[in-house]
Amino acid sequence: MSKQTLVLLYGGRSAEREVSVLSAESVMRAVNYDKFLVKTYFITQMGQFIKTQQFSEKPSESERLMTNETIELTQKIKPSDIYEEGAVVFPVLHGPMGEDGSIQGFLEVLRMPYIGTNVMSSSIAMDKITTKRVLESIGIPQVAYTVYIDGQDLEACLVETLARLTFPIFVKPANMGSSVGISKAQTKVELRKAIQLALTYDSRVLIEQGVVAREIEVGLLGNDKVKSTLPGEVIKDVDFYDYQAKYVDNKITMAIPADVDQSIVTEMRSYAEVAFKALGGCGLSRCDFFLTQDGQVYLNELNTMPGFTQWSMYPLLWENMGLAYPDLIEVLVTLAQEMFDQRESHLI
């Protein structure tokens, strides 16, 4: 039986490229090599496409994907050279230029099926401010927030923020994930510095009310018919679940399933599915919630390309539901092909 080609794109231009490499290495080991041939392409920080490795069987645990230290620029290709008829692309890319609709649009121009949400839902979900406004329109509860756009009057923003929110306050670049560029502010001075830090990553800044809450996550999978997982909980050994804690210091553990009341489970799964559909989601996403001590649920964000590392919540949530990592990849490939066929059928 001939194998189907699965194209892995990894690296990328955003500050989250290191997470992308870790995720892609986990995917390449989880693939069922009886069914798939894996071809990998590294995207440099400058946006160059580099042809790297090809795997017809499961690589050893010591095998690493080629990155900046090991690639040869002679391997550079035109981006369109990734095209292969019948192949499905897994863009294991996080953050801007990865899950913001950019690469999705490129793959649609190439007429290649790809895993994940489409151009519209990717771009909406990538921008935390736009996501909040969409979710507000359908009545999904979220923490209070204000917005700062580069070029606006910063002093006026500080006045508005301090009138509406109380410390602690969290400041986030609107278009970043993996906790990159996020700060916790306890004073007006810290708030100003946090906004300035966020502006180094994005011109749009989300300023949110801090809440004392558990962090609960729900996995989503599907196109027209969406399935959700039982929730999992991120248990932190640090005050603030930042990039360092997530991917470097390993100062988190996960409880899957989360120990929460059944009514809360039902509420979160419902909110997650409704939010996914409201954003036009397809393929997959992870929906992140805050759960306060008094039982209030707040939807924090939808992540359209969640981490796929060996310690990432998303594949572990599905494993808990009885869907093993290799089988999850196969389902994602099938969903990608379904969406491709649907898009093609709408072109007259």
Swiss-Prot record:
The job of this chain, per UniProt, is described as: Cell wall formation.
Q: A single GO molecular function, which one? A: ATP binding
Species whose genome carries this gene: Streptococcus pyogenes serotype M2 (strain MGAS10270)
Q: Which HAMAP family match?
A: Dala_Dala_lig (MF_00047)
Q: Where does ATP bind?
A: 162-217
What pathway does the UniProt record associate with this protein? Cell wall biogenesis; peptidoglycan biosynthesis
* Class of the enzyme per the UniProt entry, highest EC level: ligase
Could you identify this protein by its name?
D-alanine--D-alanine ligase
Query: Any idea which positions bind Mg(2+) 1?
Result: 288, 301
GO CC annotations on file: cytosol
Keyword set for this entry? ATP-binding, Cell shape, Cell wall biogenesis/degradation, Cytoplasm, Ligase, Magnesium, Manganese, Metal-binding, Nucleotide-binding, Peptidoglycan synthesis
Q: What are its cofactors?
A: Mg(2+); Mn(2+)
Q: Does the keyword field hold Glycosyltransferase?
A: no
Reactions performed catalytically = 2 D-alanine + ATP = D-alanyl-D-alanine + ADP + phosphate + H(+)
State the family it belongs to: Belongs to the D-alanine--D-alanine ligase family.
Pfam families, per database record = Dala_Dala_lig_C, Dala_Dala_lig_N
What does the note under cofactor report?
Answer: Binds 2 magnesium or manganese ions per subunit.
Its gene name is: ddl
Location in or out of the cell:
Cytoplasm
Q: Which GO terms describe its biological process?
A: cell wall organization; peptidoglycan biosynthetic process; regulation of cell shape
InterPro entries named among the record's database cross-references: ATP-grasp (IPR011761), ATP_grasp_subdomain_1 (IPR013815), D-Ala_lig_Van_CS (IPR000291), D_ala_D_ala (IPR005905), Dala_Dala_lig_C (IPR011095), Dala_Dala_lig_N (IPR011127), PreATP-grasp_dom_sf (IPR016185)
EC number of the protein: 6.3.2.4
Q: Is Manganese found in the keyword set?
A: yes
Pinpoint the ATP-grasp domain residues. Answer: 132-334
* Annotated Mg(2+) 2 binding sites: 301, 303
Q: What is the lineage of its organism?
A: Bacteria, Bacillati, Bacillota, Bacilli, Lactobacillales
Residue spans making up a coiled coil are none
